[in-house]
Regions:
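Mid-domain alpha/beta scaffold segments of enzyme catalytic cores
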Residues: 1-191
């Protein structure tokens, strides 16, 4: 029996950011040559979520995540949830993210971040899409909010219970890592 092929995937890169304006195609080409078969490009607001989808449409191996980063939470308004839902229905949208809480930079007041995070967790459940979680100095609150979300997923027999998402750029402690693994989250490590 032949061994299973390993599919290399970059689960978090912001290829639509201006940092790549001069060499984006070269970066994508080098990723292909290195054997990377899938790239997930998360949005941080509506504009970058649209850009992530556009890049995904232009490249077979690139997929998008759509979401509002906690430091962009002040951009959330009455239309944002509906616009994100529309973007999330695109066939190349594979996750809701990058979402979560950031108590280090505090680009938005904590209560605003929590409200926006909750709205996006609800959207992920509705759309059946996993989440990409940003957590900076907010471990207890992130775990508490995700506990409630995972409990709702279980109550509703959601397939997301098996793989609810990834804790991006994990900086928590061992207890949080164990908590995440017990709830089937992937843990993303910064390289």
């Amino acid at each position: 029996m032949a061994p299973e092929k390993i599919i290399l995937t970059d689960t978090h890169c912001h290829l639509d950011f201006a940092d790549f304006d001069q060499d984006r195609e070269l970066v994508i080409s080098r990723a292909r040559e290195a054997g990377l078969e899938r790239i997930l490009n998360p949005g941080t607001d509506l504009t970058t979520s649209r850009a992530a989808l556009k890049l995904a449409e232009q490249n077979d191996e690139i997929y998008a995540a759509v979401g509002v980063h906690p430091n962009s939470a002040l951009s959330w308004n009455g239309d944002t949830g509906g616009e994100l839902e529309e973007l999330a229905s695109h066939p190349k949208a594979k996750a809701i993210g990058e979402i979560g809480l950031d108590y280090y930079r505090k680009g938005a007041p904590i209560e605003v971040q929590r409200t926006v995070f909750t709205a996006q967790l609800s959207l992920a459940a509705k759309m059946g899409l996993p989440v990409i979680i940003h957590n900076r100095d907010a471990c207890e609150d992130v775990m508490g909010m995700l506990n409630g979300w995972v409990d709702e997923l279980k109550k509703n027999n959601s397939k997301l219970v098996d793989r609810p998402g990834v804790l991006h750029s994990f900086s928590g402690n061992l207890a949080m890592a164990e908590w995440a693994v017990e709830r089937n989250f992937f843990i993303g490590l910064t390289g």
